[in-house]
Amino acid sequence: MIQSQTFLNIADNSGARKIMCIRVVGTTYQKYAYIGDIIIAIIKEVVPNTKMEKSEIVRAVVIRTSKEFQRDDGMRIRSDDNAAIIIDQKGNPKGTRVFGPVLQELRQWNFTKIISLAPEVL
């Protein structure tokens, strides 16, 4: 579960390393973001000599959470960290590589580009 003020690792090569969630995109009463949800975040840590800047406001999609995710068949999947991928306004990732596994449920939520870049799909 990702809420406001939560720090997330970045799982792509867009230039940011850590972001902090400031808002969950969607309804006004939704407090938490889960896997596949879009958040608005601030970049807190960047890789040197990249286009991204610290304190820049970006949109990101959550791909891994420490809180377990339960599939329809009852299987629960949990990750070691909270991770996200920075996206543009159209939903395409800004990076060209994705690090770490992603869930196959992202395909249902129209993030097929992220699925195709991922090295492992669970």
Swiss-Prot record:
Stored InterPro entries: Ribosomal_uL14, Ribosomal_uL14_bac-type, Ribosomal_uL14_sf
UniProt-listed GO biological process terms: translation
Subcellular location: Plastid, Chloroplast
CDD domains: Ribosomal_uL14 (cd00337)
One Gene Ontology cellular component annotation held by this UniProt entry: chloroplast
Annotated Pfam families: Ribosomal_L14 (PF00238)
GO MF entries: large ribosomal subunit rRNA binding; structural constituent of ribosome
Subunit structure and binding partners: Part of the 50S ribosomal subunit.
Function: Binds to 23S rRNA.
Family indicated by similarity: Belongs to the universal ribosomal protein uL14 family.
Protein known as: Large ribosomal subunit protein uL14c
Naturally occurring in which organism (per UniProt): Gnetum parvifolium
